[in-house]
Amino acid sequence: MYLPQEIIRRKRDNKVLTTEEINFFIQGVAKNTVSEGQIAAFAMAVYFNEMTMPERIALTCAMRDSGMVIDWSHMNFDGPIVDKHSTGGVGDVTSLMLGPMVAACGGYVPMISGRGLGHTGGTLDKLESIAGYNIMPNNDLFGKVTKEAGVAIIGQTGDLAPADKRVYATRDVTATVDNISLITASILSKKLAAGLDSLVMDVKVGSGAFMPTYEASEELAKSIVAVANGAGTKTTALLTDMNQVLASTAGNALEVREAIRFLTGEYRNPRLYEVAMALCAEMLVIANLAKDEQEACIKLQAVLDNGKAAECFGKMVFGLGGPNDIIENYDNHLETAQIIKPVFADKSGFVNTMDTRDLGMAVVGMGGGRRVASDTIDYAVGLSDMIRLGQTVDSNQPLAMIHARNEDQWQQAADAVKAAIVISEEQPEATPEVYRKVRSQDV
């Protein structure tokens, strides 16, 4: 028998907690026998003293096991179950292409995604811009669509990792969000409850990333890889660039359009292509669907070229209540803003730096994201035709096209975009799309 306050005291005094102590505390969180004040004190003790890797694994497993853990064995899938998770960014629409691409190569991708958080866009918000798309199907439909389309992207139900929900809500109001141990357990408890064989993490680096520095992003990637593998799920991570908007668009319906155009080959942003291919290739290799990255890229290019990846996306959308012609007639099913006008820089030159976070907040400011959880989203607004770092701007080349509801909103967004992008006379050095991979042997 343990007491919550004694477990808190031990962590406060920088002692290493046992697996049994952590299990007891998290079970209490799930059963409401541990108070909000005790959760806050525990989170702050961890914040100041951190956790060892075995403690992080125990915390992740306890939070994963606090609710339902999906078992797919009865579905008799004829391929591996694989997923990816991104720490979030702006114009980060990779999930919408990556799920169908991996599915078309023989994987099964039951992806449980989140809403937008702060300046970052949420995959669920993007999908909800498609009329009829059901992000909260019952488990039977989730399984059925995953089996038939190879991919299903849905929201987190209350019975998956419920302890995390309570812990996260408390961390959010007690200044304990930015802690590697707690972030690791929060991300992985939800992901591992989805019953995955393997996972690829996309950890963002740069001005639009969740973590403030490259070193912090790398530390998080290593923590996630070590803990997930320690918890029994084969996991690798890629550190990818978020010093500029990843896609050509930022905004919900705009990003869905771009994802569909990417899958059909109508238009592929080169940076988005590099990141999507790198993540997909890693997913195929880790799931034993390809022997190496080169073979994986050949398979992925084939399913883009022959239309199988686009077909998987269409099947998923239709299976989850959306239209059956989203690929062919996407404009009929996605909202369009009333005002679509370019914004120009005040001077000519090279795009030197971009505050990607501020660009994300410009989209939120137009109603494309939530300031508080109860806000409703305007799916049509956002940015498109985004300029990239190193490109030249002048009176003919705009920084972006702004999609707004009215003139006032357009002007506010235009001011924000201009303030977020620095123009200089010298061309900056190019940054890579993918900085490095972190595999289990690296941690």
Swiss-Prot record:
KW Transferase (keyword) present: yes
Pfam families: Glycos_trans_3N (PF02885), Glycos_transf_3 (PF00591), PYNP_C (PF07831)
InterPro entries: Glycosyl_Trfase_fam3, Glycosyl_Trfase_fam3_N_dom, Glycosyl_Trfase_fam3_N_dom_sf, Nuc_phospho_transferase, PYNP-like_C_sf, PYNP_C, Pyrmidine_PPas_bac/euk, Pyrmidine_PPase_CS
EC number: 2.4.2.4
Catalytic reaction equation(s): thymidine + phosphate = 2-deoxy-alpha-D-ribose 1-phosphate + thymine
Superkingdom, taxonomy of origin: Bacteria
GO cellular component terms, A-Z: cytosol
Keyword tags: Glycosyltransferase, Transferase
UniProt signal peptide: none
Pathway: Pyrimidine metabolism; dTMP biosynthesis via salvage pathway; dTMP from thymine: step 1/2
Keyword Transport: no
Molecular function, one GO term: thymidine phosphorylase activity
BP GO annotations: pyrimidine nucleobase metabolic process; thymidine metabolic process
Family according to the record: Belongs to the thymidine/pyrimidine-nucleoside phosphorylase family.
Function recorded in the entry: The enzymes which catalyze the reversible phosphorolysis of pyrimidine nucleosides are involved in the degradation of these compounds and in their utilization as carbon and energy sources, or in the rescue of pyrimidine bases for nucleotide synthesis.
HAMAP family assigned to the protein according to its UniProt record, in alphabetical order: Thymid_phosp (MF_01628)
Subunit structure: Homodimer.
Name used for this protein in its record: Thymidine phosphorylase
Species name: Aliivibrio salmonicida (strain LFI1238)
Gene: deoA
